[in-house]
């Protein structure tokens, strides 16, 4: 199984059962999340989390404000079509502050933490912030686009 996995689900009642399933499939570390109607960690309200670590599932509620990230109204993080979403992503990776950056930091930070590159979610968020602010995240996207034949 995978060493680590961050999985968003559409229903908060699925976070614990799916974390257990991931453990049964051999995943060692995982976070299954549902954030205020979204299948990701959110800034619009609280996020329900089931974290799998060393065979044990612990569930808790995550609030972005505990990490210094302000709450946002749902309209502030709403995406659009593919071109609009690409524009938003590029602006975040170029260092633009705002609700889109905030939600990217939370979710990237969780992935970094679950991937074992940070000791906790706060450390993962700091790592994500450093990657964006240094330009490394945008550079990685451009490199991925080149090798895949895309045009980011």
Q: Which role does the model predict for each range below?
A:
Residues 1-152:
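Glycine-rich anion-binding loops and their surrounding alpha/beta cores
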């Amino acid at each position: 199984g995978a060493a680590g996995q961050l999985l968003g689900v559409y229903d908060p009642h699925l976070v614990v059962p799916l974390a257990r399933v991931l453990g049964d499939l051999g995943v060692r570390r995982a976070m299954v999340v549902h954030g205020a109607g979204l299948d990701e960690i959110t800034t619009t309200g609280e996020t329900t989390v089931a974290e799998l670590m060393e065979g044990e599932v612990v569930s808790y509620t995550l609030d972005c404000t505990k990490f210094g990230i302000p709450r946002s109204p749902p309209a502030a993080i709403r995406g659009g079509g593919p071109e609009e979403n690409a524009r938003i992503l590029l602006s975040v990776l170029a260092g633009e502050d705002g609700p889109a950056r905030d939600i990217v930091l939370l979710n990237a930070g969780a992935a970094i933490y679950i991937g074992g590159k940070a000791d906790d979610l706060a450390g993962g968020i700091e790592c994500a912030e450093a990657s964006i602010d240094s330009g490394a995240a945008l550079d990685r996207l451009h490199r991925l686009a080149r090798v895949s034949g895309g045009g980011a």
